[in-house]
């Protein structure tokens, strides 16, 4: 970035020659650059907005054709000012997360406890690992200064969630989240087991994100998410009941080869009720949707996947603009 021969013009957007785009974060600033193979040099680097950086991250794995040359954009991650990890050293009932750190909660197996986590710094993140049986988790945002919230969606360790469960085993667990400000209020990855109830209220962005997991969930309640209420990918999910309201974009988004079985769903006030994409298979027994622009949508988004399928046995959709939207690769079947 200190090389004066590298163009830094924000209007410089045309890539010339055969090369690859790459992105990174440097000192809290987002960058997108283009490297030309034939000349073995960086043609240009430019600052980009966080929304464009997020789009680059979400489209990882998709190839681009530039000047008749196919390449995959690369994300280099974050340089400088990485958040420090702090391992919580003792088990207690309430934790105050008041420093700009990523806190790690990993105490092995825990039974029958109620654990409370208070977020008191906009840069605090939480990683949870372990085995939990009949444990109640409660997460609350106590941050008073919300000026930095718009830039807090991704932390410097590229954690998307305020709360991040990794490699976790659940048994009859409940999760409650209020007023979270990250890209995902609650993110669960590489985990399995049964969850009794998840309740998420007032998310600045996505409410609940499930990835690479196999989960049985009795009840999900989401009220207020500026983006998706539920987002699942690369996994196998059974949800017995979901009650979702005031979802800024999608009520439920299912993608990337996921299998979702929803027994009963109620979705009020969303842009799209259920969106299934990219080789995902979605099966719903009973579904009620009200005040959505689109009730059901099935499509292929990424080149490396095929279309998607939605099967609904009983659909009651009211006050909508489009009932079903499906592309040529996908299928929606309503009995």
Place the predicted regions along the sequence by residue.
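Extracellular beta-rich repeat passengers
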Residues: 2-335
């Amino acid at each position: 970035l200190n090389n004066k021969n590298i163009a830094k013009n924000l209007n410089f957007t045309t890539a010339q020659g055969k090369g690859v785009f790459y992105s990174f974060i440097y000192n809290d600033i987002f960058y997108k650059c283009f490297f030309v193979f034939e000349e073995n040099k960086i043609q240009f680097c430019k600052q980009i907005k966080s929304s464009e950086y997020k789009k680059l991250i979400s489209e990882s794995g998709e190839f681009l054709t530039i000047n008749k040359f196919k390449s995959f954009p690369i994300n280099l991650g974050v340089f400088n000012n990485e958040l420090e990890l702090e391992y919580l050293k003792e088990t207690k009932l309430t934790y105050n997360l008041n420093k700009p750190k990523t806190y790690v909660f990993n105490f092995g197996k825990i039974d029958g406890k109620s654990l409370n986590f208070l977020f008191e710094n906009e840069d605090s993140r939480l990683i949870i690992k372990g085995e939990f049986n009949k444990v109640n988790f409660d997460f609350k945002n106590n941050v008073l200064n919300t000026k930095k919230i718009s830039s807090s969606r991704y932390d410097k360790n590229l954690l998307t969630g305020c709360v991040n469960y990794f490699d976790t085993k659940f048994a009859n667990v409940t999760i409650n989240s209020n007023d979270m400000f990250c890209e995902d209020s609650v993110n669960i990855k590489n985990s399995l087991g049964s969850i009794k109830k998840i309740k998420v209220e007032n998310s600045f962005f996505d409410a609940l994100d499930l990835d690479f997991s196999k989960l049985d969930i009795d009840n999900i309640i989401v009220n207020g998410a500026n983006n998706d209420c539920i987002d699942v990918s690369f996994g196998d999910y059974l949800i017995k009941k979901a009650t979702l309201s005031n979802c800024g974009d999608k009520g439920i988004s299912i993608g990337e080869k996921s299998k979702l079985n929803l027994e009963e769903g109620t979705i009020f006030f969303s842009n799209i009720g259920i969106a299934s994409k990219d080789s995902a298979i979605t099966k719903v027994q009973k579904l009620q949707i009200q005040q959505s622009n689109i009730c059901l949508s099935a499509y292929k988004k990424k080149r490396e996947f095929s279309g998607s399928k939605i099967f609904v046995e009983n659909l009651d959709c009211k006050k909508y603009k489009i009932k079903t939207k499906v592309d040529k690769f996908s299928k929606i079947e309503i009995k």
